Amino acid sequence: MKGTAWRAALTGVLIRLVARLVTAPRPVWSGVAPVARQRLYFANHSSHGDFVLIWTTLPPRLRARTRPVAGADYWLASPLRRFLIHDVFKGVLVDRQRKPGQPDPLAVLREALDGGDSLILFPEGTRNTDDKGLLPFKPGLYHLARDYPEVELVPVWIDNLNRVLPKGEVVPLPLLCTLNYGEPLARIEGEDKADFLARAKRALQALAPAGASVPSDPVSPDTAPPDTTHPGSTTPGSTTPANSTPGSATEASGPREGAPND
């Protein structure tokens, strides 16, 4: 047991070192700070390396309690992957091929949240390798946000990683990556699933750098995102502040951590 823990710790150090050498990941915290709060980080998904970068760019005290949500079919396919996801990343595995009658796939995520852990989630559900915008969000984000109102919902835009590790490749290319951490998404009382997921998608798209090819969904006056330009304010009908850390815009420089992968 002690030997496994030692190997996992050393492997984690090596992974963070390689990630920094290859991509020099730069976390930018805007409207949110890297503080010890229970959170659900939701991000765009273009590579198996996505959650590794989030995991790498979280400070150690946050990384220790932040677990990526990942596809069991991929991460259980070999002894090495099992070691990485279980012992190094402490991942939460979900069965993406669930058949009728099988347990609720969100049960393991609820168990992790009930235990006080934060999660890294990719609401698109699979890797998105084109430049046509985000895929439709899966409903899991909505259900977890509804059932755990105390957990902050932090969008994270990962820029450039699809060029560092394209789908099907195993050798990364040395390119710089930026991770934009945005302000927590507010809950709006009575908001239905479709409206919530559309608003979460817009919040994530808004973090994409200028010039990125990320088409926005059409927004009508009735579904426009709430005004969160005033720090500390709440939106009409909201039960959670739109910005839990008013006015903060911080670049964190130490290790940090990540979310769901396939």
List PLM regions with ranges.
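Alpha-helical membrane-targeting segments
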Residues: 1-25, 76-89, 169-174
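Helix-to-loop junction immediately C-terminal to a conserved catalytic motif
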Residues: 15-45
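Catalytic core of membrane glycerolipid acyltransferases/transacylases, capturing the structured
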Residues: 35-97
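Residue-level preference for the first positions of well-ordered beta-strands
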Residues: 38-40, 118-122, 154
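Internal catalytic-core helix/loop-beta-alpha segment
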Residues: 92-136
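A charged, well-structured terminal subsegment
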Residues: 106-107, 111, 177-200, 205, ...
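A cross-family acyltransferase "interaction/gating" segment
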Residues: 129-194
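Intrinsically disordered, low-complexity terminal tails and inter-domain linkers enriched
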Residues: 212-261
